[in-house]
């Protein structure tokens, strides 16, 4: 009698559902996955090593390029670690701006996730809806930093600059008539804060639209319910964090459990799943978008009433003002020294973690008293999530592997780093 053997299948690295450069070696029995072996390192750029030869401030742009969908939250973890070692206080207004932009970034990430995840499973429309809203948030990034993605907006000691008074306007072109242009610029007539406020006022309706398309959709439920179930105990053992952990029913959120910046003053809830399957993780992330709206609204309200500095007054860390630099020789020398040599950080080590849209993003920083890190270790949430893929995919079909990769919300910039 013929012997029945399992066969091996390569999934990726150029598969559209592999989310970048994932190579999965699947061992299949018919169409059922017996083993899933992720091969990583195809996007390795030696970020941790490069940081050792750059001054502390020069490594901020590297952080944007780790998880390139949640740019500012990566920077946040890095600057928090530096601030811990320096022992400096960040002005209150800068803390509120950081929290506001963390939540904007969370929404940006979850919009990308819901669009891509639905597209992988076969729902095309959601992708188009989600990117409509991402466009507005990208414009907010551009307004404060000049870049749509890699912002490098956070600085050790605060943020690069205060929120501008004017929002960039759409310019006239051949493809837009006057009426369409006026409608597009309607919300852009005020300040950046007005634009963000307007966005978060209309955004709940947009989230309702995504839910209309997906939550009770029969096909969506058939593809997600009961797939990739992780028990609360296993979720903890495998080092899952963020929505992956909360989807399994554990209410662990660093914004509540280990508050940083002004999160302890924010009023919001932590959404938690029940069954620990892909559908619960979907519901958790959708509810997280709604909670981000609440947090952002509270920040906007405070920022309107409380003007103030957005950078520490510690001159070892903060650059001089532009006016001072162009009128005063000492300020010019100070500016030159700060951006060529950088500041020296006292000897020691620090770990700072933030509640990243994907989980716990941590930076472990070791300083030997020089102007560069002695060692920088990045704790990427996606790394632990990808490690759990084998266990989650076992016994499921090939098509379900796509769903599981989608629910893990994997980005390879941070995994391979």
Curated annotation (Swiss-Prot):
Kindly provide the name given to this protein in its UniProt entry: NADH-quinone oxidoreductase subunit D
Record function comment: NDH-1 shuttles electrons from NADH, via FMN and iron-sulfur (Fe-S) centers, to quinones in the respiratory chain. The immediate electron acceptor for the enzyme in this species is believed to be ubiquinone. Couples the redox reaction to proton translocation (for every two electrons transferred, four hydrogen ions are translocated across the cytoplasmic membrane), and thus conserves the redox energy in a proton gradient.
Q: Does the keyword Cell membrane apply?
A: yes
Show the InterPro entries listed in the entry: NADH_Q_OxRdtase_suD, NADH_UbQ_OxRdtase_49kDa_CS, NDH1_su_D/H, NiFe-Hase_large
Give the EC class as a word. Answer: translocase
Organism (species): Burkholderia orbicola (strain MC0-3)
Under the subunit heading, UniProt states: NDH-1 is composed of 14 different subunits. Subunits NuoB, C, D, E, F, and G constitute the peripheral sector of the complex.
Show the PANTHER family listed in the entry: NADH DEHYDROGENASE [UBIQUINONE] IRON-SULFUR PROTEIN 2, MITOCHONDRIAL (PTHR11993:SF10), NADH-UBIQUINONE OXIDOREDUCTASE 49 KDA SUBUNIT (PTHR11993)
Q: What is a GO molecular function of this protein?
A: quinone binding
Name the EC number(s): 7.1.1.-
Out of the domains of life, which is the source?
Bacteria
Q: Does the keyword Thylakoid apply?
A: no
Reactions catalysed: a quinone + NADH + 5 H(+)(in) = a quinol + NAD(+) + 4 H(+)(out)
How this chain sits in the membrane, per its record, is:
Peripheral membrane protein
Which keywords label this protein? Cell inner membrane, Cell membrane, Membrane, NAD, Quinone, Translocase, Transport, Ubiquinone
């Amino acid at each position: 009698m013929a012997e029945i053997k399992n066969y091996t299948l390569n999934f990726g690295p150029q598969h559209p559902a592999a989310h970048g450069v994932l190579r999965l070696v699947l061992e299949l029995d018919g169409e059922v996955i017996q083993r899933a072996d992720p091969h990583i390192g195809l996007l390795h750029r030696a970020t941790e090593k490069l940081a050792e030869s750059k001054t502390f401030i020069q490594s901020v742009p590297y952080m944007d390029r780790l998880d390139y969908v949640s740019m500012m939250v990566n920077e946040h973890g890095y600057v928090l670690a530096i601030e811990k070692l320096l022992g400096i206080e960040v002005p209150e207004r800068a803390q509120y701006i950081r929290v506001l932009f963390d939540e904007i970034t969370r929404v940006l990430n979850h919009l990308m996730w819901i669009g891509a995840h639905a597209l992988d499973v076969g729902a095309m429309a959601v992708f188009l809806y989600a990117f409509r809203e991402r466009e507005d948030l990208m414009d907010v990034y551009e307004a404060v930093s000049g870049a749509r993605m890699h912002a490098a907006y956070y600085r050790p000691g605060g943020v690069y600059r205060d929120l501008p008074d004017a929002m960039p306007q759409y310019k006239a072109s051949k493809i837009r008539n006057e009426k369409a242009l006026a409608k597009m610029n309607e919300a852009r007539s005020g300040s950046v804060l007005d634009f963000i406020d307007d966005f978060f006022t209309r955004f709940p309706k947009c989230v309702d639209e995504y839910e209309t398309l997906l939550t009770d959709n029969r096909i969506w439920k058939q593809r997600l319910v009961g797939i990739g179930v992780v028990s609360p105990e296993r979720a903890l053992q495998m080092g899952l964090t963020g929505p992956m952990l909360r989807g399994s029913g554990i209410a662990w959120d660093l914004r509540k459990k280990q508050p940083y910046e002004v999160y302890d003053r924010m009023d919001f809830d932590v959404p938690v799943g029940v069954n620990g399957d892909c559908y619960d993780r979907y519901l958790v992330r959708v509810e997280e978008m709604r909670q981000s709206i609440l947090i952002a609204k509270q920040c906007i309200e405070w920022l309107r009433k409380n003007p103030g500095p957005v950078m520490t007054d510690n001159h070892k860390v903060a650059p001089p003002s532009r006016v001072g630099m162009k009128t005063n020789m000492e300020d010019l020398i100070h500016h030159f020294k700060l951006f060529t040599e950088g500041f020296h950080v006292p000897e020691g080590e620090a770990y700072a973690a933030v509640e990243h849209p994907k989980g716990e993003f941590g930076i472990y920083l070791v300083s030997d008293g020089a102007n560069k890190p002695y060692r920088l270790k990045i704790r990427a949430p996606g790394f632990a999530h990808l490690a759990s893929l084998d266990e989650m995919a076992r016994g499921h079909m090939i098509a379900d592997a796509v769903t599981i990769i989608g629910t893990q919300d994997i980005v390879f910039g941070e995994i391979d780093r």
